[in-house]
């Protein structure tokens, strides 16, 4: 996979789409590839399996989340509304 110093993994797009968009894509992909906190066991071991599917490598919990992050802003608001009486 081609990479460049300025845009990392978005270097695969070459000179297309402009630098600003490629930097934004690189930032989103970098966040996506990080390990995230598991909502079940609390460990930082959640990886993306496919679009919207996340799995904890420690406890094996599989759950649906956002396409690029396990918890979306709308999901956090909904969870807050459900948990409070």
Swiss-Prot record:
The keyword Methyltransferase does not apply. One of its GO terms (cellular component) is ribonucleoprotein complex. Pfam families: Ribosomal_L37ae. One of its GO terms (molecular function) is structural constituent of ribosome. Signal peptide: none annotated. Binds 1 zinc ion per subunit. Coiled coil: none annotated. Its cofactor is Zn(2+). GO terms for biological process: translation. InterPro entries: Ribosomal_eL37/eL43, Ribosomal_eL43, Ribosomal_protein_eL43, Ribosomal_zn-bd. Disulfide bonds: none annotated. A zinc finger (C4-type) spans 38-59. Keywords: Metal-binding, Ribonucleoprotein, Ribosomal protein, RNA-binding, Zinc, Zinc-finger. Belongs to the eukaryotic ribosomal protein eL43 family. This is Large ribosomal subunit protein eL43. The lineage of its organism: Archaea, Methanobacteriati, Methanobacteriota, Thermococci, Thermococcales.
């Amino acid at each position: 996979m081609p990479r460049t110093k300025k845009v990392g993994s978005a270097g695969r797009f070459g000179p297309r789409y402009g630098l600003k968009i490629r930097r934004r894509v690189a930032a989103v992909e970098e966040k996506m590839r990080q390990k995230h906190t598991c909502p079940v066991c609390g460990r930082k071991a959640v990886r993306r399996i496919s679009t919207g599917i996340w799995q904890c490598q420690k406890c094996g919990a599989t759950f649906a989340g956002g396409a690029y992050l396990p918890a979306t802003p709308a999901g956090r608001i909904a969870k807050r509304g459900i948990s409070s009486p």
